Design a protein with these regions (language model features):
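Catalytic core of pol beta-like nucleotidyltransferases
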Residues: 1-22, 30-36, 45-95
Length: 95
């Protein structure tokens, strides 16, 4: 299993490959109050190939941790959107 920095770099590479606008880490890992086996929560915006991105995260990401991916271009609860806005850490943003 790769270090989290390497995992985040892989996520960035997948975002670039799938033409995403932005990827945001949220949840306990973004807040810094995670446990060692806590999952990785990421939100993706403007991803042209979201299905491919999800596939790469599920099948190719070098981690044994669970990864939850939400698509910010779909309808999400206001509570979740508020959490992402409050706690989110940008992992990738297209320039």
């Amino acid at each position: 299993m790769a270090s989290l920095d390497k995992v985040y770099k892989q996520i960035e590479d997948f975002a670039r490959e799938c033409d995403a606008e932005k990827v945001v880490l949220f949840g306990s890992r973004a807040r810094g109050n995670n446990l060692p086996k806590s999952d990785i929560d990421i939100a993706v915006a403007g991803c042209r190939y979201f299905g491919r991105f999800s596939y790469l995260i599920e099948e190719r990401l070098d981690t044994l941790l669970d990864v939850d991916v939400v698509n910010l271009d779909e309808s999400l609860s206001q509570q979740l959107l508020d959490e992402i806005a409050r706690d989110g850490v940008i992992l990738y943003e297209k320039i």
